[in-house]
Amino acid sequence: MGPERHLSGAPARMATVVLGGDTMGPERIFPNQTEELGHQGPSEGTGDWSSEEPEEEQEETGSGPAGYSYQPLNQDPEQEEVELAPVGDGDVVADIQDRIQALGLHLPDPPLESEDEDEEGATALNNHSSIPMDPEHVELVKRTMAGVSLPAPGVPAWAREISDAQWEDVVQKALQARQASPAWK
């Protein structure tokens, strides 16, 4: 018995359970009866686990107890692809929900979609420079920002040399130039 074995003597194996053609993530592998009884020798058809490349006999897939079949997991994360079920396929969605419940997981309900939120979101995406606010909120923001002062080391020298009126003129010209030029999206 070498370092390739678990303390119990059973070989360590990772696999993907394939049920009806659907591939799931790493799942528990149900031990066979000899492993449950604490049999120390290797089981028929199983090899020692090691970090080396899998042998040909380990790559073969076969049917196990209760119709389960085993498929080795992909060890290269860059090649891993996730297939998403089509939104309209109710059977697949129901199957996924059943699996989530069987695993004891709870996912929060999706937020309710509202037409008002969609319109506001579309408007905000089209016009990045404005946030819809009522006049009272605008005044509150102005009063709050008027009270903000930056520490002297935080203000660059060029900003100390320009007056507020000159700065407003620079900002207005920049805004007009941005509105006149085509968007670079």
Curated annotation (Swiss-Prot):
A Gene Ontology cellular-component term: cytoplasm
Protein function: May play an important role in spermatogenesis and/or testis development.
Sequence segments annotated as region (Disordered): 1-90, 104-134
Alphabetical GO biological process terms: cell differentiation; male gonad development; spermatogenesis
Identification of the protein by name: Male-enhanced antigen 1
Acidic residues bias: start-end ranges: 50-60, 112-121
Tissue expr: Highly expressed in testis.
